[in-house]
């Protein structure tokens, strides 16, 4: 069973994914190649969200499905993969059509801001980028394109695991 987690920045996507990694899943990333390009070609040393967003979007201008095609190919070769960076409607839809379990994690602005402040010294840069399409489009993913919708918070892991246990039995 392959799982894709969608949500805004600081919503807890990586926390959910890491929980699955502890249970034997392998984490892969739609943005992994973007980060690799940013490090190799732009000497990015610490997370530069605007740079990553620009690289990702420019590649999507060349071929809109570039990142999702890469992940679908991995999913055809491996099972028990988890992705924690689904951001776009087409990504969620294509992954679900390919048999992936798609989970959307919602977060309120106040909690999102608190988490960014606690995570990044330059949290304002991240907060100011919340109007980027990679942040806004995730909330346009239709309910029919997700298998499970969760609210960010202490119960999210337990709710996710209960759902996945039910699916696997």
For each predicted feature, which ranges?
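Hydrophobic positions on the alpha1 helix immediately C-terminal to the Walker A/P-loop
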Residues: 16
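Conserved lysine of the Walker
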Residues: 13
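ATP-dependent small-molecule kinase phosphotransfer cores
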Residues: 26-80, 87-90
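Small-molecule kinase domains that catalyze NTP-dependent phosphoryl transfer to phosphate-bearing small molecules
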Residues: 66, 105-169
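Active-site signature of alpha/beta-hydrolase-fold catalytic machinery across serine-
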Residues: 19
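ATP-dependent NMP and nucleoside kinases share a basic, alpha-helical "lid"
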Residues: 26, 72-119
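P-loop (Walker A) phosphate-binding loop of NTP-binding proteins
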Residues: 8
């Amino acid at each position: 069973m392959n799982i894709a987690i969608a949500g805004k920045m600081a919503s807890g996507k990586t926390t959910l994914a890491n929980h699955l990694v502890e249970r034997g899943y392998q984490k892969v990333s739609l943005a992994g190649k973007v980060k690799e390009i940013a490090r190799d070609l732009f000497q990015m040393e610490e997370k530069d969200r605007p740079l990553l967003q620009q690289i990702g979007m420019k590649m999507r201008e060349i071929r809109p499905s570039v990142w999702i095609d890469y992940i679908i190919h991995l999913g055809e070769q491996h099972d028990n993969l988890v992705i924690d960076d689904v951001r776009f409607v087409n990504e969620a839809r294509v992954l679900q059509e390919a048999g992936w379990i798609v989970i959307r994690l919602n977060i309120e602005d106040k909690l999102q801001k608190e988490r960014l402040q606690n995570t990044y010294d330059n949290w304002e840069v991240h907060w100011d980028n919340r109007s980027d399409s990679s942040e806004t489009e995730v909330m346009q993913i239709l309910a029919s394109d997700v298998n499970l919708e969760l609210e960010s918070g202490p119960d999210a892991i337990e709710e996710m695991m209960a759902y996945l246990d039910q699916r696997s039995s």
